[in-house]
UniProtKB/Swiss-Prot annotation:
It comes from Homo sapiens (Human). It is found in: Cytoplasm; Nucleus; Cell projection, Podosome. Pfam families: ARHGEF5_35, PH, RhoGEF, SH3_1. Ubiquitously expressed with highest levels in placenta. High levels are also found in colon, kidney, trachea, prostate, liver, pancreas, pituitary gland, thyroid gland and mammary gland. In fetal tissues, expressed at high levels in kidney, lung and liver. Expressed at low levels in lung and heart. This is Rho guanine nucleotide exchange factor 5. The modification Asymmetric dimethylarginine is found at residue 866. Residues 299-309 have a biased composition (Acidic residues). Its main location: cytoplasm. GO terms for cellular component: anchoring junction; cell periphery; cell projection; cytoplasm; cytosol; nucleoplasm; nucleus; plasma membrane. PANTHER family: DH DOMAIN-CONTAINING PROTEIN-RELATED (PTHR12845:SF2), GUANINE NUCLEOTIDE EXCHANGE FACTOR (PTHR12845). The modification Phosphoserine is found at residues 184, 445, 450, 983, 1011, 1044, 1126.
Amino acid sequence: MEAEEAQRGASPPISAIEEFSIIPEAPMRSSQVSALGLEAQEDEDPSYKWREEHRLSATQQSELRDVCDYAIETMPSFPKEGSADVEPNQESLVAEACDTPEHWEAVPQSLAGRQARTLAPPELWACPIQSEHLDMAPFSSDLGSEEEEVEFWPGLTSLTLGSGQAEEEEETSSDNSGQTRYYSPCEEHPAETNQNEGSESGTIRQGEELPPEELQESQGLLHPQEVQVLEEQGQQEAGFRGEGTLREDVCADGLLGEEQMIEQVNDEKGEQKQKQEQVQDVMLGRQGERMGLTGEPEGLNDGEWEQEDMERKAQGQGGPEQGEERKRELQVPEENRADSQDEKSQTFLGKSEEVTGKQEDHGIKEKGVPVSGQEAKEPESWDGGRLGAVGRARSREEENEHHGPSMPALIAPEDSPHCDLFPGASYLMTQIPGTQTESRAEELSPAALSPSLEPIRCSHQPISLLGSFLTEESPDKEIDQNSQQEESRLRKGTVSSQGTEVVFASASVTPPRTPDSAPPSPAEAYPITPASVSARPPVAFPRRETSCAARAPETASAPLSMDDPSPCGTSEMCPAALYGFPSTGTSPPRPPANSTGTVQHLRSDSFPGSHRTEQTPDLVGMLLSYSHSELPQRPPKPAIYSSVTPRRDRRSGRDYSTVSASPTALSTLKQDSQESISNLERPSSPPSIQPWVSPHNPAFATESPAYGSSPSFVSMEDVRIHEPLPPPPPQRRDTHPSVVETDGHARVVVPTLKQHSHPPPLALGSGLHAPHKGPLPQASDPAVARQHRPLPSTPDSSHHAQATPRWRYNKPLPPTPDLPQPHLPPISAPGSSRIYRPLPPLPIIDPPTEPPPLPPKSRGRSRSTRGGHMNSGGHAKTRPACQDWTVPLPASAGRTSWPPATARSTESFTSTSRSKSEVSPGMAFSNMTNFLCPSSPTTPWTPELQGPTSKDEAGVSEHPEAPAREPLRRTTPQQGASGPGRSPVGQARQPEKPSHLHLEKASSWPHRRDSGRPPGDSSGQAVAPSEGANKHKGWSRQGLRRPSILPEGSSDSRGPAVEKHPGPSDTVVFREKKPKEVMGGFSRRCSKLINSSQLLYQEYSDVVLNKEIQSQQRLESLSETPGPSSPRQPRKALVSSESYLQRLSMASSGSLWQEIPVVRNSTVLLSMTHEDQKLQEVKFELIVSEASYLRSLNIAVDHFQLSTSLRATLSNQEHQWLFSRLQDVRDVSATFLSDLEENFENNIFSFQVCDVVLNHAPDFRRVYLPYVTNQTYQERTFQSLMNSNSNFREVLEKLESDPVCQRLSLKSFLILPFQRITRLKLLLQNILKRTQPGSSEEAEATKAHHALEQLIRDCNNNVQSMRRTEELIYLSQKIEFECKIFPLISQSRWLVKSGELTALEFSASPGLRRKLNTRPVHLHLFNDCLLLSRPREGSRFLVFDHAPFSSIRGEKCEMKLHGPHKNLFRLFLRQNTQGAQAEFLFRTETQSEKLRWISALAMPREELDLLECYNSPQVQCLRAYKPRENDELALEKADVVMVTQQSSDGWLEGVRLSDGERGWFPVQQVEFISNPEVRAQNLKEAHRVKTAKLQLVEQQA
């Protein structure tokens, strides 16, 4: 930053400024106008004259270019001394002009006379580029056109003037602050720039700018205060830009103003310049308004957006505050202007709409800039004034709507100038930034169309637009804006599908420049750069426009106008930009314009060498047509242009292309483009001019590959729309490999001629600075323009840019470049982009064959390649459904992401291959899908979620995609490489792919907004999930396959994860799979399901059971009817304690087998009966629950048992008792799950689990039996340690507080094995109930169920045996016999019930009245005898009588006694110790106690016939109950119990249907099932299991 600031401080020589002014933007524009059939034609001659003058100065500036290039490389502002000197003058002039309208008028005149207003000095150009290649130096537009435009829209000119003044004030403020800003020169004042250049080139004058303000003021469009406010805002914006933060507002305002001024310089130095200044003012005002609007979509709140911009720009310098103020000031005037201009633009809306209709015909509708205004006046608005007015109005509206950078405002001013030269071009410019500012582009375009904005030609707007796009704060907004802008562009005729493409077209239209002539400024080289709209205005680019072009890529978001402002350095950078080298990760900001525009530049003017051809009339026409409906008519093929950009750049560029559609991407592109510009400036100063060889959007599309998404957009619309005109003699500029920094890494980009070998027939008003070398064909007619549009020529070896983009792409891409790559993917790959260069203009309908790589999570499944149809730039062209671009990379954060190479994943190649690997249509279900179609472990499912893979990750997690895309854009430009870049690509491509919803998506992916996104998302927002997911992103796209594929192996245990990001995977409800949650040491197989859910088994089972309970409750009021195809309803109806599987499936909808994308999208379900579907769901639930169980075991073993700190607090015996054989249990479970998953993968539609359970039954017995048997010691040891070992307590507390435990205690982990084996039996029982009677599957299920049932019985017996033995030993120590003694301890004896009762005795009295006496008696009921004892001190008992169980009987007592004596029952001993009969009367405290004793004393009952118990009440357990006495029944949630008796005090006795166990339990734990049909169904299922078991026993016997 310091170096950049220093450079900013050093203003480049005025000669450089002159060089900019020399750039014949006006002639170009005039030619453009002529192509449009507007008055611009009349200006062609003056423009040519001016061009030659500019060439003369360019010759001088050539030296300055070197200096500028150097400055640009260092990213310093290029305020040249002359410009610096001029700045004060300009400031003074502006101040005067602002002070009084008279002074403004006088000044404009004087300035016009002397052409004091010069093109934005190189410093301006450099500054915009440096600050964030926010804007491309505006191209000077033909004065004549501007004059005409001014005449059409004096209000616009006044607005422009106001903007210029605001910029002047901004410049002054920036100068006062002593901060040199890239935009300071540009934004400080277009007037200041004009003065500098006016002194040298005499092309632009402040006076000119002032009159427009005056006009505006007089017309009510702009008030003096507003003008001042605009100026201040412009200054502030300039400050922000100077700070090096790519402020969209500042860049847009300052750069646009300056660019417009430059354009005016290029145009007539006199009145035209004044008009341009006016237009610029209007533009600036609009820009400010737009910026304000961007800040608040409809509130015109510049404050928020400005604050964000300030924060972003604050990174560079203190300019942000000024920028914000200026934005705020501009808002009001701009709003007023917007109102007035909107009215004007409305007049043109009809024409624009016409054009839009045309564009829509070509599929450009999606991204067409609202050209309603333009279409209405397509012929007339081509003058540029109308376009500017309409563009402004719309851009403001769009800004307000999108909260995005004030791209529309920028675009509007720029569009006006462009409209002067090339209303379409400027319009395109507007649209380009419009990936973010598409809606703005729409606004601007109409504005540009309606008012004669030729004065607006000054490429101020590009900067502003770029800045606005670049602003980080509006990534989300930008995305929306991008889509809207793209749409508006389509309407306008720009390649709306890819706003960048439109920009490219306009840029490509820039007239070919001679090597001497300054290379098309970034705007020219990259008119489509996010600086975008300003990119065209930078007609005054220095001869070194190549450097600008180079920058343009970097400043992708910052239109070339930023690059253009610095004739020397920027011009050099232009080639890089043109080449689509958003080489630096910073390029993301420019995606809107830069992505496509840059690529085309690379192929057109950007390409060095003779191939750089002047933009042919076709290009101009194309640009114009782009601006109008014609442009969108032919969707350029992103593939064609994507090849132009180096791979690395392409990756970023592509992303940027898409980014162009998204403001966030633009901002990211800006940053990247800045870096790339700094590197590219030097090597590609002359060559970069050539990238504009194809002025068409195709050219831009060619360059858009730099952005990644732009290729797709441009290729879709621009390429098709623009047919390469016969290349005029290509003027090969010195081809210098452009060095672009991608992700902060400098990359050498070899400037190459654009794919369109034809020299740009004419420089679009915005992007053409170099003198037009050949007659610029006039393409007023959209069809004509299209015809004139040069088709991208087949990639020539000379196209270094193309090779370079690949080279860069191949180079280790910084995280930032990754983002752009997704755009390139729409083609086939970065390489394929080269192949597509020569694509002839095709109907927009056809999108690139290969969809761009989907953004990570953010994008969500819409990005997946499966869908196959991506509409790049909103084009309907279908991409191969098989494309790999459907990469569901955005996986949940926990998922493993693509290998670090993933940073390049955004690259078209990487994304393509990844998408292919990831995208298996069947992999939608994260876990199960993975099973079906496991992807290579190297294919991370969560590239997006896993930020580590690249910086883009931040953008994604942001996210996100997430709306991943917006988050990606928000991420730094570097992040944009993978995140933003992808998101742009995802936007462009997803729309295409969205044609079919990704199979990956599972119903459990609520977060996946991208999944199955319709092709209509072509606006580039397809990424918005998102993206994301992944983010997105829930299981977003992580399918079953993915978890299994994850290298971590255990991280993704199940399907949902696969789709979680963008890919398919959410079949299982489980949430994101965590890579580390793999089965601890088990390496045999990477579990696909183990980490599919974030829930541990404890929580998972609770959730499932709770849902089961809820479904049962709902069924109470419903009759059991076969539900629809959905298995849930049937389950609900069949809910029973045994149907754990049903409950589990119902509990987690995401874990449903039917939700696996492969299953859901297949026809198998149609041929399956409802019962068969339920059976599969039950079996699948067994697998899913086992994965969750294993995850919990891994924590128990790895986190607790293997903890060294915990082990230090325990003795060996304590450690053995506490953990027993837990590790063995874990290993068996891991093997079991592995076999289950393998079985499932072998046949997902009819997989088996019972045979696997049966095969593992011996292993279960080997580990579960000893572990469960040790449970008693385990509990005691744990309790003892907690009570006596403080160290253990402290360490355990610390371990349990770890997030991995999810607030669960160690005890809950230790009891899991027994719980699991019990529930596993219940799951098998549910499977058995749904099998066909007599089938082999029923036999296997019965065997497996019986084996587990026997295991559980043995476990229970072992546990009880130990406990009973201990209890007998304890009692033997407490009991004494006063009667016959007998041995109490016996292995066959256990205590059934014990308690103290009150014995009632009647004593005989002399009066024959019996007296009732009471005494306490303690009963100990064993399974074989009963002891009666008297309690003693010390909990001791004295036995006075006992009897065998067979000789005792209890019964209710019907005796009515007076007093409190209730709850009585009789005990009869037929034979006591003495061999006599005895009778006792006992009283209990409660009725339940009485009933429980009577029940315990009763003889064992025969087993009930369940089919005869239909009238018996049933209850379902709501809360688990742990028995406190031996006669109580342990309950688990969802258990169904048939009630046999109940007491008045809230206790029930019943038989559990699942296993026939009997016992008592409190009524508070259960809920009665009132529906008789449900009760009958529960009984029927229980009977079915019982019958099958009996048959098996008989067979075995």
